[in-house]
């Protein structure tokens, strides 16, 4: 993808390398995909929500819960769906026995039958930030993981 920054630095064209939206950073792929503060409030959130929507749709299908045939038409609601001792919550505060600061992940799959819980909180970092982002999410939800385990065992 040829950005203004590439046109200026590689092709030596006389163009302004700054992002036209924020006018603060050079318009690089990294900036467009995950760094522009003007896109942060809308496009990044929209991308995050679409991924959560798709994951929620897939999870419900795996548990044979009826859903729309097209994932993009699926409308997850912050509610609990229960089927065979399995609950799937979407953007819902998790109720546990102890006070937990981070208690609202994107999706939680609670399988009481198997004694397992899956906590999903989506982040979409650039490749270079993947390990840091994963570690941050793990740390953020560690207390919720422990409290949830205690509730189902």
Task: Describe the residue ranges of each PLM region.
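Nucleic-acid nuclease catalytic cores
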Residues: 146-153
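Helix/loop segments that flank and initiate small ligand/metal-binding modules
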Residues: 1-26, 50
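Active-site metal-binding core of divalent-cation-utilizing nuclease and nuclease-like domains
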Residues: 13, 66-119
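Short beta-strand-loop-alpha-helix junction that forms the active-site gateway
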Residues: 104-105, 115-136
């Amino acid at each position: 993808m040829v950005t203004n920054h590439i046109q200026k630095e590689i092709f030596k064209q006389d163009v302004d390398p700054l992002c036209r939206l924020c006018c603060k950073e050079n318009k690089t792929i990294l900036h467009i995909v995950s760094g522009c503060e003007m896109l942060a409030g809308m496009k990044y959130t929209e991308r995050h929500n679409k991924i959560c929507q798709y994951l929620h749709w897939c999870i419900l299908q795996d548990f044979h819960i009826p859903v729309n045939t097209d994932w993009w038409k699926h409308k997850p609601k912050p509610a609990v769906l229960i089927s065979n001792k399995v609950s799937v919550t979407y953007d819902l505060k998790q109720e546990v026995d102890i006070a937990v600061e981070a208690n609202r992940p994107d999706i939680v799959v609670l399988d009481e039958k198997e004694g397992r819980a899956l906590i999903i909180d989506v982040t979409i970092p650039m490749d270079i930030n993947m390990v840091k982002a994963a570690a941050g999410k793990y740390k953020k939800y560690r207390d919720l993981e422990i409290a949830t385990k205690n509730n189902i065992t």
